[in-house]
Design a protein with these regions (language model features):
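A helix-coil-helix interface module used to build multimeric assemblies
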Residues: 1-202, 207-211, 275-276, 287, ...
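Glycine-rich cofactor/substrate-binding loops
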Residues: 1-37, 98-99, 280-456
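Short runs of predominantly hydrophobic/aromatic residues within well-ordered alpha helices
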Residues: 38, 85, 89, 235-238, ...
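Short, well-ordered beta-strand elements within core beta-sheets of diverse protein domains
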Residues: 41-51, 120, 167, 236-244, ...
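Charged, flexible cofactor/metal-binding loops and thiol motifs
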Residues: 117, 122, 144, 152, ...
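Generic, well-ordered alpha-helical scaffold segments in large soluble proteins
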Residues: 41, 62, 66-69, 91, ...
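Conserved hydrophobic residue
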Residues: 50-51, 75, 265, 380, ...
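A generic structural-conservation signal
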Residues: 54-55, 152, 222, 383, ...
Length: 456
């Protein structure tokens, strides 16, 4: 098949080479951005008298027709074309004849594809950001519901100190809020227009790059034409942000998986977000959370694939850069899918308050508060720490808990103990004493909820 770029060569390539070289099976998803960019480009060419207004009007009308026909299904994208840019230009030329051949004036596919992918990823970034905000809202609403629900807090997966389930959930809300901030920051660098950089050196035509940038929603220009066509930092940065976001979702998923197990029984997932077993009728498997955890590695792989592709490329454009899209598109699709399932999974998740509280009553998670009680009586912390540890060891040896020890036993370890110690080591008291900013007290959790909602 002869190509629109035939000139130096006859354009007659082997079928296997055509298939190997083609990107339309994956870059066709950018047809809307490609056509929108071309309409603005045609208008700019007319505004600078590079083509006539009549030709520009015909080009824009023809492009609108192609867009409408693709949207309606009347025009299937020809997968035999090399890429989406060539498909659109070929279809336009078929409809308009020689006028269609004027569209590519003062433009290269190098800056055209750089434009398309920035516009496409800008939209996808905004979609992901909104999905993350929906998840933050779901997590925050759940945190408010359970702001007084006592559970063990863990370090090393060992029971450590009493917290509330609301406090634990708000930790994820804060992580996700940082993800939103990172995406917004990435968008600033992404939203620079490369159109007008042409192949690599700019153009001899008196174009108006600012006109195109403004009308395509960009905040400014790529100010070096070599950089404009070869830059894929915004892809790598977006995928880095996605990798961190997926890491947060994976950590949350891991805890949901643990919490929903019989060993914990802290939460119950809706049947709508679990599956059964083909052989074990009693099973209720947290497959959605497990898949999110598994797909995290996939997004990491997409990022590493892109970075590896880019690491040795000389300036400016190289065909290797065609390989950026499949990695980026896969990461976009995966992240969106994970968020779309995560939001309702959290919204429908129920906490088992009795099991959480029962778990908090074991493991001596109020031992720190016992030490703090002695510190407030005037004992140095390290001395108080030692006494508290000795009392825990005594309880373990005698199969009891701190709350059940008589005062006489406490007095054998320190004469600073009195009846008030039982209030000090009460679990709800332990929680409510954590009044520092960011702490687990109900008031502190309420302040965190208020902050996050204001930030959204």
């Amino acid at each position: 098949m002869a190509k629109m770029w035939a000139g130096r060569t006859d354009g007659m390539t082997e079928k296997i080479a055509d298939d190997f070289n083609s990107s339309i099976r994956f870059d066709s998803r950018m047809y809307r951005q490609d056509i929108t960019g071309s309409m603005v480009h045609a208008a700019m060419l007319a505004s600078r008298s590079i083509i006539t207004q009549a030709d520009a009007d015909a080009l824009i009308e023809g492009l609108e027709g192609i867009l409408n026909d693709i949207d309606s299904g009347a025009l299937p994208i020809d997968m035999e074309c090399e890429d989406i840019h060539m498909f659109v230009e070929q279809e336009l030329t078929n409809r308009l004849g020689d006028v269609g051949k004027k569209l590519h004036t003062a433009r290269s596919r190098n800056d055209q594809v750089a434009l398309d992918i920035r516009m496409y990823l800008r939209e996808e970034l905004d979609t992901v950001s909104q999905l993350v905000k929906q998840l933050i809202t779901a997590v925050t609403d759940k945190a408010e519901e359970y702001k007084s629900a006592i559970m063990p807090g863990y370090t090393h997966l060992q029971r450590a100190q009493p917290i509330t389930f609301g406090h634990h959930l708000m930790a994820y809300a804060m992580m996700l809020l940082r993800d939103v901030e990172r995406l917004a920051d990435c968008r600033k660098r992404m939203n620079r227009s490369p159109i007008g950089c042409c192949a690599l050196a700019g153009t001899t035509y008196d174009t108006d790059r600012d006109y195109e940038a403004k009308n395509l929603g960009f905040d400014g220009l790529c100010l070096n034409s070599l950089d404009g066509v070869s830059d894929r930092d915004f892809c790598a940065e977006l995928m880095s942000d996605f990798a961190i976001l997926m890491m947060h979702l994976s950590r949350f998923s891991e805890e949901i998986i643990l919490w929903s197990s019989w060993e914990f029984k802290f939460v119950e997932l809706s049947d709508a977000f679990t599956t059964g077993s083909s052989i074990m009728p009693q099973k209720k498997n947290p497959d959605m959370a497990e898949l999110v955890r598994g797909k995290t590695g996939r997004v990491y792989g997409d990022l590493m694939g892109l970075l590896t592709t880019l690491k040795g490329l000389p300036l400016a454009y190289n065909k290797d850069m065609q390989e950026d899209k499949e990695s980026v598109f896969d990461a976009v699709d995966t992240v969106k899918m994970c968020l779309q399932v995560f939001v309702p999974m959290v919204q429908t998740m129920k906490a088992n308050l009795d099991n959480m509280k029962l778990a908090a009553q074991k493991g001596f998670i109020n031992a720190t508060d016992l030490a703090d009680y002695l510190v407030k009586k005037g004992l140095p912390f390290r001395s108080a720490y030692k006494i508290s540890g000795q009392l825990v060891a005594y309880c373990i040896q005698n199969n009891t808990v701190l709350e059940a020890l008589p005062l006489d036993t406490y007095l054998q370890y320190s004469d600073l103990f009195d009846q008030e110690l039982y209030t000090a080591i009460d679990l709800m008291t332990c929680v409510e004493k954590r009044i520092s900013k960011g702490g687990t007290s109900v008031a502190s959790v309420e302040a965190q909820i208020k902050y996050v909602r204001e930030m959204l």
